[in-house]
Amino acid sequence: MTDLAELGETIKAALPAAVSNASIAFGELTLTVDAAKIVEVVRFLRDDPRCRFISPIDVTAVDYPGRANRFDVVWHFLSPSLNTRIRLRAEASETTQVPSLIDLFPGVDWFEREAYDLYGVIFTGHPDMRRILTDYGFDGHPLRKDFPLSGFVEVRYDDDEKRVVYEPVRLNQEFRKFDFLSPWEGADYPLPGDEKRSE
């Protein structure tokens, strides 16, 4: 079964309480799932002979600060036998705890830790839910859209104290805004390589 629309309908029919939507974008099937039922969905995708999504590719999140459930937790899987990828999306709030997939796929360990570290998404049942990319005492989650661009503190090595020190961020100049729109030429200016483009 390689037809994505047919595969999406098959999965929706098998898991009607867990899968609310199936859509195809850019040649990839996307399922909208209930976050609380993610383990059930992924177990089906792994074990069902029509699916065989046996390889987790990534776990990440997308931040929509204007929504009540501000995060979309996103999982990507690959079925080598079908030569097909699938994307699972589930909404979560800052306090929603999403079940971990580590019992089904031990390889998602660092993916889930990264999503926790950078977005603050908490995965229940994960044996080692701690930061993986930022420093131990790091304040906040840097990929959230409300995190300041310059961060909260500056980390540097102090030669006098012979250790790493944390200081408030000092900006020596204001952020600059580069406006490339020419009032005379508009935005249709030639870019390098445009001469190779066929008309």
From Swiss-Prot:
Reactions catalysed according to its record: a quinone + NADH + 5 H(+)(in) = a quinol + NAD(+) + 4 H(+)(out)
Keyword field contains Membrane: yes
Topology class, membrane: Peripheral membrane protein
Keywords: Cell inner membrane, Cell membrane, Membrane, NAD, Quinone, Translocase, Transport, Ubiquinone
The keyword Acyltransferase appears for this protein: no
Protein's cellular compartments: Cell inner membrane
Entries under InterPro entries matching the protein: NADH_DH_suC, NADH_quin_OxRdtase_su_C/D-like, NADH_UbQ_OxRdtase_30kDa_su, NADH_UbQ_OxRdtase_CS
MF term (GO), any: quinone binding
SUPFAM superfamilies documented for this protein: Nqo5-like
Disulfide bonds: none
Function: NDH-1 shuttles electrons from NADH, via FMN and iron-sulfur (Fe-S) centers, to quinones in the respiratory chain. The immediate electron acceptor for the enzyme in this species is believed to be ubiquinone. Couples the redox reaction to proton translocation (for every two electrons transferred, four hydrogen ions are translocated across the cytoplasmic membrane), and thus conserves the redox energy in a proton gradient.
Subunit structure: NDH-1 is composed of 14 different subunits. Subunits NuoB, C, D, E, F, and G constitute the peripheral sector of the complex.
Family: Belongs to the complex I 30 kDa subunit family.
HAMAP family: NDH1_NuoC
Record's protein name: NADH-quinone oxidoreductase subunit C
Organism the protein comes from: Rhodopseudomonas palustris (strain BisB18)
